[in-house]
UniProtKB/Swiss-Prot annotation:
GO terms for biological process: threonine biosynthetic process. Pathway: Amino-acid biosynthesis; L-threonine biosynthesis; L-threonine from L-aspartate: step 4/5. PANTHER family: AMINOGLYCOSIDE PHOSPHOTRANSFERASE DOMAIN-CONTAINING PROTEIN, AMINOGLYCOSIDE PHOSPHOTRANSFERASE DOMAIN-CONTAINING PROTEIN-RELATED. Belongs to the pseudomonas-type ThrB family. It holds the Pfam family APH. It comes from the Bacteria. This is Homoserine kinase. InterPro entries: Aminoglycoside_PTrfase (IPR002575), Homoserine_kinase_II (IPR005280), Kinase-like_dom_sf (IPR011009), Pseudomonas-type_ThrB (IPR050249). Its EC number is 2.7.1.39. Gene3D superfamilies: 3.90.1200.10, Phosphorylase Kinase, domain 1. Keywords: Amino-acid biosynthesis, ATP-binding, Kinase, Nucleotide-binding, Threonine biosynthesis, Transferase.
Length: 323
């Protein structure tokens, strides 16, 4: 979450009159994250999150994102629910941006994920994948292998200002991934951005999954690889095998990974590293002046990419022939 677009108090108060969620008491921007503008609202009826969708989110995709949250909640996955305005719509426009209001989930995201958190997110991810099987809408992933070259093009000429040799590293890896990317693994609804700051816990209990603007249809094990990168590495960018094993075991109890998925995992993890390396690099080079946002370090994912390049099998992640 972040704030790129400011909203005036009187403009927000008028906007809220189109909803039945009470009168505005206070609001504040949320600086965490890098994609959309988010505000915590307190009204006479409770607390809510207001999201103004920025750059990478197309308005035509909002029915998918918001509909998916409702679909998952109906099937026992705890995630925010969009509020409908008085016209019955789940999104409209505010400050020149598509905007939606969702209910506030209790909990905190884990600043230093422990083994119990990794197990919790593994189980929740698998249950989300299962719950999404009958979701009727389909959205292709614009940030999968077919979209990485265009992202690279936005940063190629300045990549070496971030780290010497980065442009060549990315070019070589992208060529390899384009040739090797699998096309025959199980697909379905994925979250595609399930980082620690998008998962809430109350104590050790997972209380909700949030932030669905990257959800789409893609390889399920690719979503697993994204979480491996996000949850199971330490601050020095080394893999914590104990965390990885807990994550995979919990996922596998709900949805066992096939041998083909396990075999492809190192490749998928390289792709997951490239995806976030590229988007972080583009963001790092293009943060708007004065934006209330903290760009994330792209070099974290250079180190993770190099780790996965040296991996020979899923056993290097702490799992055997089956999860």
């Amino acid at each position: 979450m972040a704030v790129y677009t400011d909203v005036a108090a009187d403009e927000l108060a008028d906007f809220l009159k189109t909803y039945d969620i009470g009168e505005l008491l206070s609001y504040k921007g949320i600086a965490e994250g890098v994609e959309n503008s988010n505000f915590l609202l307190h009204t006479t009826k409770g607390s809510y999150i207001l999201t103004l969708y920025e750059k990478r989110v197309a308005v035509d995709d909002l029915p998918y994102f918001l509909g998916l949250m409702a679909h998952l909640a109906e099937r026992g996955v705890n995630c925010p629910q969009p509020a409908r305005n008085r016209d019955g719509a789940v999104y409209s426009s505010l400050a020149g941006r598509p905007a939606a209001i969702i209910n506030f989930l209790e909990g905190m995201w884990p600043r230093k994920p422990a083994v119990v958190h990794c197990a919790g997110v593994g189980e929740a991810l698998a249950r989300m994948h299962l719950a999404g099987r009958d979701f009727p809408l389909v959205r292709k992933n614009p940030l999968s292998v077919s979209g990485w070259q265009s992202l690279f093009a936005q940063a190629a000429d300045r990549a070496d200002t971030v780290q010497a040799g980065l442009s060549a590293l990315l070019s070589t890896e992208l060529d390899y991934l384009a040739r090797a990317w699998p096309t025959d693994l199980p697909e379905g609804v994925i979250h595609a951005d399930l980082f620690p700051d998008n998962v809430f816990f109350l104590g050790d209990h997972l209380s909700g999954l949030i932030d669905f603007p990257f959800s789409c249809n893609d390889i399920l094990a690719y979503d697993v690889a994204i979480c491996l990168n996000a949850w199971c590495f330490e601050a020095d960018h080394s893999l914590n095998v104990t965390k990885a094993r807990a994550f995979f075991n919990a996922y596998g109890r709900a949805r066992p990974l096939s041998d083909a998925e396990l075999e492809a995992l190192p490749l998928l993890a390289r792709g997951a590293a490239i995806r976030f390396l590229l988007t972080r690099l583009v963001d790092w080079l293009n943060v708007p002046a004065g934006a209330l946002v903290k760009p994330k370090d792209p070099l974290e994912y250079v180190r993770k990419l190099r780790f996965h390049q040296a991996v020979t099998s899923a056993r290097d992640y702490g799992i055997g022939a089956s999860a």
